[in-house]
Amino acid sequence: MNKYYNMKKVILLFIVAIISNTIAISQNSEEAEKLLNKVSENIKSYSNIYINYTYTLFNSEEDINQTNKGSFVTEDDKWKFVMLDVTRIFDGDKLYTISPDDEEVTISTQNPDDESTITPNKMLYFYEEGYNFEMDIVQYVGRKKIQYVKLIPMDSDAEIKYILLGVDIEFSQIYKVIETGVNDTQTTIAIVDFEVNLPLEESLFVFDKEKYKDYYMNILD
């Protein structure tokens, strides 16, 4: 009698533990999603955004450790993006890629479905689709409280293991993005400056052909 009673008790406790764990995971996921939704809403409330950042690529096995600086500014559907000395300007119609090393300007129509194309929108809203969320660690950087959210790709064939997205809790802004690939390459984007609602000149998103009259114009479409 005691034997069967104890067995039932163990099974019951096991079921309760599973249910409790499932509820905790669900609450954790909801809390993470709520935080990311707040970040998205906050970003979309700004008339424009200017960001300076560092971009670090690290893989100890491949002996890779590279850090570069970049910046971008975006307003409505227009943006300007600078990285590795290459400037990209999207005026709402055409995309201009300016490469000083090649002395070339490539003019094309932006394809929003092209996954290889880096745009400010992809950097600011990449987490909105294709991931499961869960709350991760909290770090303090000076007086800043940074809450990390772990993003796990829904696609089992994704080249990404997971992403840690650091959020500045006080301002509901992205602070850092740490991506770990299936090959253990770690890509880190750290926000250095995050400015919003600036008085921008209209010419900022205009390609001035006169400045590049000695460059080769590669018109794709």
Kindly give the residue locations of the regions a language model identified.
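Sec-dependent N-terminal signal peptides
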Residues: 10-20
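Gly/Pro-enriched, hydrophobic low-complexity segments
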Residues: 131-138, 142-220
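Flexible, surface-exposed loop/linker segments and immediately adjacent secondary-structure boundaries
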Residues: 110-145
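Positively charged n-region of N-terminal signal peptides that target proteins for export
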Residues: 1-10
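Beta-turn initiation residues at beta-strand->coil junctions
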Residues: 55-57, 83, 99-100, 178-181
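An acidic-aromatic
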Residues: 69-118, 187-188
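N-terminal leader/targeting segments and the immediate start of mature chains
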Residues: 22-63, 77, 211-221
